[in-house]
Every structure is written in structure tokens, then in C-alpha cells.
Amino acid sequence: MIERGKFRSLTLINWNGFFARTFDLDELVTTLSGGNGAGKSTTMAAFVTALIPDLTLLHFRNTTEAGATSGSRDKGLHGKLKAGVCYSMLDTINSRHQRVVVGVRLQQVAGRDRKVDIKPFAIQGLPMSVQPTQLVTETLNERQARVLPLNELKDKLEAMEGVQFKQFNSITDYHSLMFDLGIIARRLRSASDRSKFYRLIEASLYGGISSAITRSLRDYLLPENSGVRKAFQDMEAALRENRMTLEAIRVTQSDRDLFKHLISEATNYVAADYMRHANERRVHLDKALEFRRELHTSRQQLAAEQYKHVDMARELAEHNGAEGDLEADYQAASDHLNLVQTALRQQEKIERYEVDLDELQIRLEEQNEVVAEAIERQEENEARAEAAELEVDELKSQLADYQQALDVQQTRAIQYNQAIAALNRAKELCHLPDLTADSAAEWLETFQAKELEATEKMLSLEQKMSMAQTAHSQFEQAYQLVVAINGPLARNEAWDVARELLREGVDQRHLAEQVQPLRMRLSELEQRLREQQEAERLLADFCKRQGKNFDIDELEALHQELEARIASLSDSVSNAREERMALRQEQEQLQSRIQSLMQRAPVWLAAQNSLNQLSEQCGEEFSSSQDVTEYLQQLLEREREAIVERDEVGARKNAVDEEIERLSQPGGSEDQRLNALAERFGGVLLSEIYDDVSLEDAPYFSALYGPSRHAIVVPDLSQVTEHLEGLTDCPEDLYLIEGDPQSFDDSVFSVDELEKAVVVKIADRQWRYSRFPEVPLFGRAARESRIESLHAEREVLSERFATLSFDVQKTQRLHQAFSRFIGSHLAVAFESDPEAEIRQLNSRRVELERALSNHENDNQQQRIQFEQAKEGVTALNRILPRLNLLADDSLADRVDEIRERLDEAQEAARFVQQFGNQLAKLEPIVSVLQSDPEQFEQLKEDYAYSQQMQRDARQQAFALTEVVQRRAHFSYSDSAEMLSGNSDLNEKLRERLEQAEAERTRAREALRGHAAQLSQYNQVLASLKSSYDTKKELLNDLQRELQDIGVRADSGAEERARIRRDELHAQLSNNRSRRNQLEKALTFCEAEMDNLTRKLRKLERDYFEMREQVVTAKAGWCAVMRMVKDNGVERRLHRRELAYLSADDLRSMSDKALGALRLAVADNEHLRDVLRMSEDPKRPERKIQFFVAVYQHLRERIRQDIIRTDDPVEAIEQMEIELSRLTEELTSREQKLAISSRSVANIIRKTIQREQNRIRMLNQGLQNVSFGQVNSVRLNVNVRETHAMLLDVLSEQHEQHQDLFNSNRLTFSEALAKLYQRLNPQIDMGQRTPQTIGEELLDYRNYLEMEVEVNRGSDGWLRAESGALSTGEAIGTGMSILVMVVQSWEDESRRLRGKDISPCRLLFLDEAARLDARSIATLFELCERLQMQLIIAAPENISPEKGTTYKLVRKVFQNTEHVHVVGLRGFAPQLPETLLGRDEAPSQAS
């Protein structure tokens, strides 16, 4: 059989109150229970939205909208969502066992229209282990998760192998996939189909009779023309008797259900409370013992924590004292590092300034040379300018003289004049007023000798000047170097100081070379000193931890002793660990074994109960599974024999029934064809003529006529001949006797009567011998006698058949019980008792726990000793390598000595660094300081004076030479007057004058340019001197600041300072870390002590309270046990499998049973009062009284004429067997009565008959549905009279209207419309065309009228309208109609989808509190019979006993609203298979 698809779960993501909630849907009924606003309607709205994601249809009304012409703007969906991405998903499993997840992504659209965006999607191939919430959420941390958008969901699913994700752009495609996969019952091709589907769901959701559906039932229930199907003959008359019988069975079944309900619920109610009290008593005893153990353990823990607190407080005080010293040392180290870094920066500046000073010194020297060269060039330019001036003056004078010389006289005259001028100039220059031309030669020799002497003197001075200038510059340079190194001093002291400085420089340079070795040595010694101090600190700490002072010589022996102790303790700890592991492993194995036994115990107990029941039913004792299988084989053999005997009796009974039916025919005809032939031939049956024969004569006449006793007596055989031609519908042998039926006698035969026989002489050569029959059937009296005997035999056979059927049913039920036992319990039924083993294991577990506790205490002590020894060895491992340091007492003195030497070397290094360059420059020129060139200025003046004297002597000699040369010109005195101008000479002189003036101008410009350049050179020199002086001053300031800092600024000083600071920082950090750890541990220890103190007080209080409670409860429990044993109900109540359930589960089980019992005994005053009294939780014995009262009540109600037992449980089993037998018998009878109808000629009539039969089949499923006063619901389908007349004319009188159908101008539809108008002229067709009317007439649905009727109370059958029914009745009736519609859709769509698909079937019901318990139960039975899932929303006062119930409570926590959901499985037992078979029988027969 194809399994029906089921909705597995509904998942809501980010809905109002539901962030990520999955509701597992029951296979039948899922109940959403909760108060107003709990979220029931929101859950159903999410389901409907995923089923029909059409915003044009979705409208979740609210009761506050009553009377409003339009709903809220968002139609109830926008407000049910939260901001962001939301999902609603349905997890389904179809008939092919394919898992399909369909759903929609919803998101609020911003704006005042409050719109919602919906995107449908489907997921196929998803593994069963993957939950829907895992797909659409991503966990961020333990308390946060986010909802994945649709694109991320698609990427996530595409990454999973075998999983298909489909997103739909149209709702039609979405619904098409759902139809093909068997999720919805009908293919929704258009918006109209979706609207019908939504109206169906909406009517189901809000309950009641939907006018939208009832007005258009034909559209919902009747499919379109889909071909011709066979029709079935109306079985109403044949089924009426069965229904009446089944009604009687239902009445009896109600008693059976009441018995079963009362027993099961009373047993659950009392047994759950009984076992809960038993469990609680055991739990209280265990808790009291556990409290006592915990009290002892907590006292020990408190003492240990107090000791620990004292130790940690002492250590914390020590660390607090050491932290101040470490902070001071660390601050000092940080300040020292800052000073070193500052000194290094100062040293870098000093080096940089010294480099700059060296560069400035070089540039200054170069600039001095440049200035000196510029001065020399300036002097040359001045001399050149002066010579140019002299030449211009001379040319001007010559031009003036030569202007008068026009001829030779003029030349002589000019010469004369020049000679006179030269003589005058010579007088002037030589200071010889008496000089004459004649004496000039004498004076020339004198002045030439004087010039030579002046020249020699000048050259000598020039040589001295050059040498003095060189010595003067070296002396100044050496003197400045000495001043720079030593400071101001007298010039005469420079030589001695310079020699002393050079000797000191050699010594300082030698010391400076020792800086690096000394620094390395100091660093090494300081490191050893720190290690020595660290070793001393470690030794002091070790002695403090050991509580004893040790000498250095004792440490190695102590180390060996501790290592030996560690080795021994390590072995002990190792062995203890192995022993503890073995104990824990055994404990875990015991615990695992106990858990497995506790899980197996309920199964074993259930198997034992089942085995005991089987033993009681069959009266056998079974000791092994082989006994069970052997007995099952015997049972099968007995069942086979009983079935064979029952079938034989049934066959005989059927034969008797057929014979009675045959003998009951009027006229005694055993063949109906004989009556028809007799009527056709105009004769009478021979059996009718002899119908009044007596019972005594009946054997004679039966033997007399023999086979011809069924003959037909006709008046004339000749008239029959023509009828015999072609006769086929007759018996194989047909006897005809000619005679008068009114006066017929037996004279037609020649007869000889014998004893109990006759001989009939048929002809001369043919006789017939016939004996008298033992059971004559000739004549009415014989037949009646036979019928009477057959009835008696039939009664015997019926009773025997019933007995055999009962035995078969009982054997089958026993066989089924054995089969269930073999399938469920055989594997564990004959195993050892797990409870006995659990008791043994628990005792062993207690021993192990005690051993583990003792072992842990011993191991803890060893571990503490091991840790102490290990810490000691660790400390010694750090101390022993430093023993030589601890023994070195002179290390600190050596460090101080090396530090002093390093200071001296560093001072020397600073001296060398500061004055090394000056000393290097001073060393090669120090000898110039021996003599001071003080006469350099006088020499310089003498040199200038000798230059001037040499120049004057040269001019005097030149002037005298010129006079001597012009001595002849003096004789031209007479030609002076005769001078005349010579223009040519004049012009030449003028040209030379212009050239001389141009040269003079150039000389002047060059002099001015060079003067400006000289001025620039002097400015640059002054700037360089100023920069040099400034830099020098800054360098001196920096050197003074470096000396003021007082820190050695060498290359490794910063690294040593940083290492020292980091070491102190590490020590300070470690100290602080340890101090913080101790503070935290101390705080934790104090808190732990406080907690232990509070725990001790609470444990003491709980222990005494629990002890008092155990003592108090003992008296009540003894009373309960006494009452249970006195009434013999311990076997019913002491259900050991319930001992393994929790108290909450048992209390829930008892509460559910109590709710069901309140409804069950509502009509019984006695049981109601006893039940009310039993609800007192302080009086558990009253529940036992109620259970005894229920049993007594049921014993009184057992019908002893039907069921012969005093035990209500056995009575229920026998009643189930009897009802199953009756149901099976009536079902088989109904199947025999179902005969096929005659086929009809018209396709419309056949289709109508088919759909009428289908509606009748739907009605059969609703006949037993009752809601309140409504006893039954049915759907009436009638053919309209006008259309029925049209069908009759079409099938039988169509020849009369051939003018319409043979017309070429009319189509068939139009001809059909014309015929309809012709037959019904009184009907106004309106504006519709014949074509439209004809198309409507071709649709068989227009021939039918449908309406829903209910059988309500004394009113009988009436039309189902909401105004005539109560709210609950309207809900139940509307639900019945919807079930019919769903079944109709499935039948219609079966041919469209796969043959192996049976679609899901689910409806809703909101606010189910309007239905009473009987109506709810009816819905449950309807769902079970129709394999339909139902989602019910009900307040908290409804607690269905079947299906799955979700308790919804909406809560607000920290401004966050969420719905708390608790799911409960149904606790009512399932209906037996035979009853389910009875319920399904009508639909199978249909």
C-alpha cells in the first residue's frame, strides 16, 4: 500500500516571538495550546504563508475586525514578522520517501503601506540529519546567531553535495512542484485554483461553514469531464440494514471505548502517582544520604581552604613588601637609561659639532688664502690704474707739447721743451734744484747706485718677509691649538704647555685604547654580580620555602636527596595514577553498564509484562524463546484447523442460506427462468399445481415425477412449438406437460408403487425407478418443513460459525500478541533480570566510590609532597650552577675597581675624542713655538718702506736717465719759437691718448670690481669666523653639559642600561603577576570559604529537613501499601517500567489522565466525587480508593450475557474480539450486496452517476461524524428536473428532434441549447447566446444540485447553515465538508500525478475550544481514518490525549519578546488494527 505523504515539521525564522523555532508535526493531530496572544495564530499563519505565498489572497483576520468592511492594511502578515530576513519552511516526506523542504523568504518592505516581500523556494535531497534551522541560521557564539539571506542560503546549499535548491519567480511553478512531489492535493494552474485552495484553508482555519465554499460546492467537489467511467447500482436499500446493524455495534463499541478509556486513564492516573511516590521515597532516601556525605566532604574542604588562605595571605604580604623595592629599583634603572640616552644624544651632537668645526676650520683657512690673493690682485690693479693715469697725463702733456711742433723745429722745440720738463722733473724727484744737463750724468751714476742698493735691500727684506710670514702663520696656528686644548695662556708659555700636552695626549690615548676591554670586563663582572645576587635571592627563597637555612656545601646533598624523593614519589604517583585510572575505568564501565541496564530495564520489564500476559492467556509457562516459538507453531496449527473448520461451516451455512432462498421462491420454482417461460408459454409450473400437497404425500409425488417435477404444464403443446424455436434462455432440461392446470392429475403416467419407491413406465421400452426422497421438497408443506429444518441447522451453523470465528479471532489475536512479542520482546524477554544486576552494580559502585575517595586523599598528599620536592629541585637546579658565584666574596670589589679604571679610561677617551685632532695638528708644528715672530710687523713696515724707497730711486734714476738722454735737446732752445703744429703727429697723439684713457677706464672698472669682490671675500671670511666662534662656543657648552650629566656615554652603555631596566621590569612584572594571582586566589579562596560556609548551613538545613520528610512520609506510604495489597491491585499499579521515568513525566502523565478522567466520569456522580477526593496530593491513598471504585464500577457494568468474566480488562478484550467479528461479517455482507449497475447510453448520465456514487462514498466517510447535536453529515446531489428531462430526450426520444441535430447551421452545442429551450420554454435565457448555453449543458456539473445536510437532534435532516447550528456544530460540519473537498481533489488529481504518490492531507482549526471533548475525539477519529493531519489551536484548558501538543507561552525578557514552547507527545493507546480495519471497510467497499 502506498504510504501517504506527511508534513514533518514547520519552521519559523525571525517571526514575532519565534526567532528559530521548529514544530515537529504529528502524523495525525498537532495541538497548539496556549493563552491569548501566545502565538498559535502566528504559527498557523506561517504554515499558510508557506503553503500559499500569494499576497493577493493572504489575509489573517483578527476578531477585532468584526464589522469592518476591510481588514488591516497589512492583512495581518506584516505585524507577525520582525525586521530583517524571515523564513517559513515546511519539511515534508512524500510517498516515495523523498524529503522535500518548501518555504518562503519574507521581508518587511519599508513604507506606510506595510507590505511584505515573499520569495518561494524548495530544497530537495537534503539529508535527514540536517535540521531546517541549521540551514538558514549561522551561529555567531553561544548566545547569538544570525539569519542567512536567500543568496547566502543558496550558496550554502549549492556547496552541499546532492542537495538541489530551487527559487521560484512565480507561484504557479512553486505549486506545480509541490503537486508533482505530493505536497498538495490539487494542481493549482491559475489564480482561481489558488483562490479555491486558499478559501479551503481559510475556512478550515477559522472554522464554521464557509458560505464561499457551500455556494460553489460543485466547483470544489465535482471535477470537469474526464471520460466515461463505470457507474454502480444504488446500494442504499442493501446498505440500510448494515448501517442499522453497525449503529448497534457502535453503541456497544461506545461501552467498550468507555471501559477501555476508564481503565487506561485510571491506571495511568493512579499508577503514575503510585510510582512517583515510590520513586520520590527512594530519591528522598538517596538525597538524605547524599546530603550527609556532602556535609562531611564540605567540612573537610572548608578546613583545607582555611589552611590554604593562611599560606596565601603570608605569601601575599611578602610580595607586597618586595614590590616597593622593585619599583624603586625599576624607576632608578629607567632614570639611568634616560640619562644614558640623553648623554648619547649629547655625544652625537658634540661629534657632529666637532665635524662641523673641522669643516669650518678648513673653509676658514681656504678663505684666508682667497682673501690674501684678492688683496695682492687689488694692489696690482691699483698699480696698473696708477700707471694708466700716469700714461694719460703724460700723453696729455705730450699732446700739448707736440701740438706746436709742425716741422723739425717744432720737434726740436718739443724735444727741448721735453728736456727742460724732464730736467725739472728730475730736479723735483731728485731734490736737486741745482741740477743741470751737464751734471745729470754724474748724478745718474749716483742715483743708479742708490737704486741698486735699494733694490738689493728690498729683495733681502722680501725674503725675510716671506720667511717671517710663514713662521708667523705656523706659530699662530700652533698657539691657537694650544689655547684650544689648554685654555688661554701667555705666548711665551706655549712651547712648554704644548710639549706637556703632547706627552699627556700619548698617555690619554693609551688609556683610551683600554676602554673597550675594560667595558667588556666590567659587563662580565656586573653580569656575574647580578647572577650572584639572583643566586642569593633564590637561595633565600628556597630556604624560606623549605623552612630551614642551608649552607652552600649542603645544597648538592640536598639536591640528590630531593631527586631520590621525586623518583620515589613519581613512582608512587604513577602507580597511583594507574590504580586511579583502573578504578575510574571500572567505575565508568559500571556506570555505563548501569546506564545501559537502566535503558534496557523498561524494555525488559515490558517484555516480562507481555510474557506474563501471554502466559495468563494461554495457560503456559515459557522458560526460553524456543518454548515461545514452539507454542507459536502449535498456535498456528490450531488457527489453521479452526480456520478450515470455520470456512467449512461458513460454506455449509452459505449453502443453507442459498437453499433457503431458493426454497423461499413463490411457487416452489428453483429457477427464475421457469417462471418467465411459464408466463411466456401461458402455462403453470407443476410445483404450483401440487403446492398444496400434504407432507405425507410429498415423497410419493416427488418420486412420481422425478426430474419432471419442475415441468411446465401447458394447455396445448402444439402452441408451444413455435416458442421453442431459438429458445436459449432456459434450463438444460425443460419438461413440458400438456394438461389443464385447473384439473391436472397424475394419470399421465403408468405407475407401480413399491416400498418407498415407484416404477414409472414412461413408454413400452422405458421405465424409471425412483425412490422416495428422504427430504421431500415437492409441495409447500414439504418446503416449509425443509425450510424449518434448514433454519434450525442454520442457527446451529451460525452459532458454530460465531464460536469458531470467535475462537479464530481469539487465536489470531493471541497469534498477533505472540508475533508482537516475538518482534518486540523476544530478544530481551529471557535475558537476566537487569534490576538485580543494577543492584549488584550499585553496591560495587559505592565500594568503588569509597575506594576512590580514600585513594584521592592519599594521592593528594603524595602529589603535594611531589610538587614540593619538584619545586625544590627546580630551585636547586637554578642555584647549583651558581655555587662558585655564591662563594666569590671579592666579586663586588673587583667590580668597583674595574668601574674606576673604566671611568679613567673613559675620561681619557673623552679627552682624546675632544682634543685628538688638535693634538695631531699640533705635533708636526710644535717646534715653531720655540721662537715668537714678534718683529713681523716691523719687518713688514721696513719691507714696505724699502719698496717705496726702491720705487723712488728707480723714478729718480729714470728721470736722470731721461735728462741724460735728452742732453742734446737742450741745444734746441732756439727752435722753440719756430714750432709749428703738425697735424699728423697731433692725431697720433690723440689716438694714443684715447687708447690710454680707455685703458685707464678699464683699469678703474677692474679696480672697482675687484674691490667689491674683495669686500665679499672679507664678508664671507667674517661669516665663517662668526660661525666658527659660535660652533666653538656651542661645542664647549655641550661638553660642559655632558660633564654635568655625569654618565658614561659609550656604545654599550645604553644596551646595559636597557637590559638592567628590562630585568627589573621583568622582576617587577613577575612580582605583580604573582601578587595579582595571589590576590585573585585569595579572593577566590575567601569566596570559596563563604560559599562553603553557606553550603554547610544549607546542607545542614536540607539534611535535617530531608530526614524529617523521610520519616514523615513513611507512615503515609505504609498506609498506601496496605490498601494496595488488601485490594489486590498491586500488579496493576506497580508498573516497574514507570520507575525509570522522571517525576515531571509521571506528574504530567497523571495530570493528563486526570483531565481525561474528569471528562469520562462527568456523568457518574459517584466516580466524580471519588475522583475529586483523590486529587488531594497529601492523601495518596485516595487515588487507590478511586482506582478500586473504577474497577468495581466496571465489574457491575459488564454484560454477563455476552461476556463471561469479572475482570474488566478481559471483558474489553472479549468485547473487541466480538465487535471485530461482527464488523468483519457485516463488511463481507456489504461486499456481497455491492453489485454493478447497468451501463447507460448517454455519457453525461454515466458521468453524473459516477460522481453521484463518488459523493455517496464521501458521505459514507462522514456518516459516523457527530458534533454536539449533529449526529451525521451528508451531501445531497440531485439532478435538476429540467436537465433530467433533457437527458431522457437525448437518450430515448432524440429521433423526434433530429431537425436540430441534423441542421448544418447549428453546432452540436447550439442544437443542444435549442433543444433545451424547446423543452423548457418557461426559462428565460437572458442575453446568453445558444453557443454559451450549449457549452454549459455539455458540462455535467450544471445538471446537478448539491447541498450539505446535517442530522441534528429531533429536527432530523436539515440544510447545513450557520444560523441553524451552534458554533461547535458549525465548525465540525464545516470540517467535514472540507474533508470531502480534499478527498474529491485527490481523486480528481490521481490521474495527473504519479501512481506512487499519495499526497499530504492537512487541515487547520483555530480556537478549537469551541468544540467539546466528544467533538474533538470525533475529529481525531476522522483524522485517523482518513490519514489526515490536523493542526488545532486551543487555549490551555484543552489537552488532547492523542497526537502532539505544544504549550505556547509568550514571555518578555529584557524588552525582548519570545514564545516559550514545550512539546508533549500523546499518551492515549492506539486503536486496535481490527477497529481500524472496520473504520476503513466502507471506503474499501466503495
UniProtKB/Swiss-Prot annotation:
Record family assignment: Belongs to the SMC family. MukB subfamily.
BP term (GO), one: chromosome condensation
Entry coiled-coil feature ranges: 326-418, 444-480, 509-603, 835-923, 977-1115, 1209-1266
Gene Ontology terms, MF aspect: ATP binding; DNA binding
One Gene Ontology CC term in the entry: cytoplasm
Taxonomic superkingdom: Bacteria
Keyword hit for Membrane: no
One Pfam family here: SbcC_Walker_B
Organism: Shigella flexneri
Name of protein: Chromosome partition protein MukB
Residue ranges, annotated region (Flexible hinge): 666-783
UniProt KW keywords: ATP-binding, Cell cycle, Cell division, Chromosome partition, Coiled coil, Cytoplasm, DNA condensation, DNA-binding, Nucleotide-binding
Lineage, broadest ranks: Bacteria, Pseudomonadati, Pseudomonadota, Gammaproteobacteria, Enterobacterales
NCBIfam families (UniProt xref): PRK04863.1
Entry-linked PANTHER family: CHROMOSOME PARTITION PROTEIN MUKB, DUF4476 DOMAIN-CONTAINING PROTEIN
Record InterPro entries: MukB, MukB/SMC, MukB_hinge, MukB_hinge_sf, MukB_N_dom, P-loop_NTPase
